[in-house]
């Protein structure tokens, strides 16, 4: 099966055929850098990082562009509130965004352009739109005339007449039509500005992405992505101004990720259920958050809650536990018996790459792909649990481990050493306990001494006391370790 993607423009899954065989051009709208990034931003960026990784895994040479909107009303307002230059705000939050994305394991895009470094390109596109009659200047501002672009609203499938009926042009408004949108905004006192044929001012939001995508990917490219909230007006307006300026299709495939809900409610600052990436990563491991975000199909809404994050944490811990178990089995040599090859494990291991590819080729279905990972994990755990890790099964277990690792590299998960992940998780959980790690280790040492002195009553008291605090002791020939329940 060849790769099929859901195209918002057509409303159907389509076979993916890039403009240039073997090469993919992809533009994804980046953040407006005026505040801390929230988990909605995390989802969008993890989703398109996954797509970027999978396309490369599939053999494509991918040019991936993700911009920074570093001049905007929100940035200017915050700068004025803090009494600092607008670029002090944008640079601060660009640095924070980069830290968040690095923590989530994102690969760097090919290009990360800033809007303020591409003003000349924006002015050029606006000038072409005016020359072609699709835009008009009005007292220092420039607007796009939506009535001149017949296919307007083809992405969002809205009706212009109905939208006009619900709109009102305020007194003094410069627009000819309520839905006309700004390409250039005349300067106001206290705002940054650039020189232009229409006077000093700054670009509108929508023209920024059109100009930057054209510069790095050309007038027509393969994939344009972003969150569903960008379909209208941002992406709709991008299509209008780009296709009007160039007279050719803008992007062939429009891909949009679904929303993040908080405890089944829409995430909103007004509802008080707004979480930044930084806040979430103070409580959960970054790989757990990434695993959670990939556990649902990218177009489906995903419900963010402590319960769901804990379940994702447990699932990831289970996979790492299997990888650790396989590693331990392999280091023991050919111990264990296997009268015959475990057929279920053999079938799951052999067919796994093909099943993974089929899931991902079906509109990047990470939920199904991870389901196949858990199928393989269950089979491997059963073989290990039954003590059948020797003989031909030893090679099958190694194959299962390597294949889980390989798809993990594609998805950006399972990239840690199992012991390192377990230690990270243990330390994070231990920070919430009513006892320090040092005190736990001291009690373990005391318990070992008590057992050596055959003081089993004291040893049991220590074990029970730690259990009451949520700590499980694990005794083995190599010694005693602990984990948080």
Swiss-Prot record:
Listed GO MF terms: ATP binding; cysteine-tRNA ligase activity; zinc ion binding
Cited SUPFAM superfamilies: Anticodon-binding domain of a subclass of class I aminoacyl-tRNA synthetases, Nucleotidylyl transferase
Family annotation (SMART domains): DALR_2
Catalysed reaction equations from the record: tRNA(Cys) + L-cysteine + ATP = L-cysteinyl-tRNA(Cys) + AMP + diphosphate
Cofactor: how bound: Binds 1 zinc ion per subunit.
Motif ('HIGH' region): 31-41
Cofactor: Zn(2+)
Subcellular localization(s) per the UniProt record: Cytoplasm
Keywords, sorted A to Z: Aminoacyl-tRNA synthetase, ATP-binding, Cytoplasm, Ligase, Metal-binding, Nucleotide-binding, Protein biosynthesis, Zinc
Biological process per Gene Ontology, one example term: cysteinyl-tRNA aminoacylation
HAMAP family per the UniProt record, alphabetical: Cys_tRNA_synth
PANTHER family: CYSTEINE--TRNA LIGASE, CYTOPLASMIC, CYSTEINYL-TRNA SYNTHETASE
Assembly: Monomer.
Protein name: Cysteine--tRNA ligase
């Amino acid at each position: 099966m060849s790769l099929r993607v859901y195209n918002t423009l057509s409303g159907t899954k389509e076979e993916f055929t890039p403009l240039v065989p073997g090469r993919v051009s992809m533009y994804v709208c980046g953040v407006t850098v005026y505040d801390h990034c929230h988990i909605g931003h995390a989802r969008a960026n993890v989703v398109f990082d996954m797509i970027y990784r999978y396309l490369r895994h599939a053999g494509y040479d991918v040019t991936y562009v993700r911009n920074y909107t570093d001049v905007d009303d929100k940035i200017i307002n915050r700068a004025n509130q803090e009494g600092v230059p607008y670029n002090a705000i944008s640079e601060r939050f660009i640095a924070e965004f980069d830290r968040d994305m690095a923590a989530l394991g994102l690969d760097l895009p090919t290009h990360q352009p800033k809007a303020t470094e591409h003003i000349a390109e924006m002015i050029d596109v606006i000038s072409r739109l005016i020359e072609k009659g699709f835009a008009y200047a009005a007292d220092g501002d420039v607007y796009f005339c939506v009535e001149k672009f017949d296919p307007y609203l083809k992405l969002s499938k809205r009706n212009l007449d109905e939208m006009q009926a619900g709109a009102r042009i305020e007194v003094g408004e410069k627009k000819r039509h309520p839905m006309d949108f700004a390409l250039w905004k005349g300067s106001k006192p206290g705002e940054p500005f650039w020189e232009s044929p229409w006077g000093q001012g700054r670009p509108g939001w929508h023209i920024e992405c059109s100009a930057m995508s054209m510069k790095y990917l050309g007038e027509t490219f393969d994939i344009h992505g972003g969150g569903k909230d960008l379909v209208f007006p941002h992406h709709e307006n991008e299509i209008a101004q780009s296709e009007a300026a160039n007279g050719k299709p803008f992007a062939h495939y429009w891909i949009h990720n679904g929303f993040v809900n908080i405890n089944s409610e829409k995430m909103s600052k007004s509802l008080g259920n707004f979480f930044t990436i930084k806040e979430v990563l103070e409580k959960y491991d970054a790989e757990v958050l990434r695993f959670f975000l990939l556990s649902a199909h990218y177009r489906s809404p995903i419900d963010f809650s402590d319960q769901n994050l804990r379940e994702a944490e447990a699932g990831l811990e289970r996979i790492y536990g299997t990888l650790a178990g396989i590693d331990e089995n392999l280091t023991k040599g050919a111990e264990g018996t296997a009268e015959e090859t475990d057929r279920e494990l053999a079938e799951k291991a052999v067919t796994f790459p093909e099943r993974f590819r089929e899931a991902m080729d079906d509109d990047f279905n990470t939920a199904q792909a991870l389901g196949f990972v858990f199928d393989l994990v269950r089979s491997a755990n059963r073989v290990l649990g039954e003590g059948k890790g020797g003989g031909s099964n030893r090679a099958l277990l190694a194959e299962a481990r390597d294949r889980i690792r390989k798809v993990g590299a594609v998805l950006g998960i399972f990239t840690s050493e199992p012991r390192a992940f377990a230690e990270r998780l243990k330390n994070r959980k231990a920070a919430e306990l009513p006892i320090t790690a040092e005190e736990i280790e001291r009690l373990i040492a005391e318990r070992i001494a008590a057992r050596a002195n055959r003081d089993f009553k004291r040893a049991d008291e220590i074990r029970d006391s730690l259990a009451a605090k949520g700590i499980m002791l694990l005794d083995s020939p190599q010694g005693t370790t602990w984990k948080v329940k």
